[in-house]
């Protein structure tokens, strides 16, 4: 059985809530909560965050996650 890869889109410049991926929720950025839940999915080999903002990329790397930059 092959393993799945989860890619989480995380855009910093949202029109309704700018900076949402970095919004602090009980001491962690929102993107970290999402990332940690994705790691719990059965059959997942890797989790990546796709972002167009270096602040999000650095936050993901700070908690040990994997991030890839996209064009904005």
Swiss-Prot record:
Metabolic or biological pathway: Nucleotide-sugar biosynthesis; CMP-3-deoxy-D-manno-octulosonate biosynthesis; CMP-3-deoxy-D-manno-octulosonate from 3-deoxy-D-manno-octulosonate and CTP: step 1/1; Bacterial outer membrane biogenesis; lipopolysaccharide biosynthesis
Pfam families referenced in this protein's UniProt entry, alphabetically: CTP_transf_3
Keyword Nucleus: no
Cellular component terms (Gene Ontology): cytosol
Keyword Protein biosynthesis: no
Entry's localization field: Cytoplasm
InterPro entries to which the protein is assigned, alphabetical: Cytidylyl_trans, Nucleotide-diphossugar_trans
Family: Belongs to the KdsB family.
Task performed by this protein: Activates KDO (a required 8-carbon sugar) for incorporation into bacterial lipopolysaccharide in Gram-negative bacteria.
Name of this chain's protein: 3-deoxy-manno-octulosonate cytidylyltransferase
Organism: Escherichia coli
Taxon lineage: Bacteria, Pseudomonadati, Pseudomonadota, Gammaproteobacteria, Enterobacterales
